[in-house]
Amino acid sequence: MLLFLACCLAPLALGAQEEPEVITGKADAGRHLYYSAPLGTNGLSCVHCHTDFDEAAQDDGLIRAGHSLYGAASRPNWWGREPEQANAYANIGAAAAVCVEHFQRNPQRLTAQQLVDLRAYLRFINRKQQRQSLALTSGADRTGEYLGFDEGDRIKGRELFYATCHSCHPNARSGIGPALPSDREPAYYAKKVREGDGLGAQIAGLDPNAYDPSSGQFMPYFSVDRLSNRN
């Protein structure tokens, strides 16, 4: 009799165990995170570097270091890591967490809820799907000299400054980023634009150790397809 009761009650006991909670992401909460500077520790938000609209159809007057994330959720990979690689990102939310940790200087990255919320928003803006990989490129000068930037149009340069630099270096003063010196050679500024915090130099194969996450630097680099050498 005791054995019979044990057999009958065992399934009930197992059924009484709590099911693991499934976290559901909300696109509206993810959009809030996308525009939220407090998500990081330095004032940067996702939208500082990536638009959430189709840049070919819309223009807000800014030139960002990163490509638009409109439709990016359907890319086959992110950060140049192929799906079969051991360190590949499972989805765009996991790839975005890298930016939160490094560029936004948040060592805690994202909570599980924030991660699924942000992923939900990036999937929500996936109307124009991108089925091809986005190559991770850099326009860093392989010689490291950055020659040929001595001449330029000052008026055009002013317009470009406000489109690309002003949000982090307001009127060349300190803001999210440090104040910009006005007495350096053109090569100095060109190197900063192309290499950023060192990631641009590493991707170009100039220096495998140029990108150091522990350095405290977080300036993104501008590749040639974001800002041409002429600009």
What are these regions (language model features)?
Residues 93-134, 217-231:
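C-terminal capping alpha-helices of c-type cytochrome domains
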Residues 104-107, 175-177, 198-213:
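Substrate-binding/catalytic groove segments of enzymes
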Residues 25, 29-33, 48, 91, ...:
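Extracytoplasmic/secreted proteins, especially bacterial periplasmic and envelope-associated proteins
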Residues 35-39, 51-54, 97, 101-105, ...:
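Sec-exported extracytoplasmic/periplasmic mature domains
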Residues 1-11:
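Bacterial N-terminal signal peptides
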Residues 20, 24-39, 44-47, 51-63, ...:
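N-terminal Sec/ER secretory leader and immediately downstream segment
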Residues 16-40, 127-160, 178:
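Electrostatic cytochrome c docking/interface patches
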Residues 42, 47-93, 170-201, 218-224:
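Gly/Gly-Pro-rich "capping" loops immediately C-terminal to redox-active cysteine motifs
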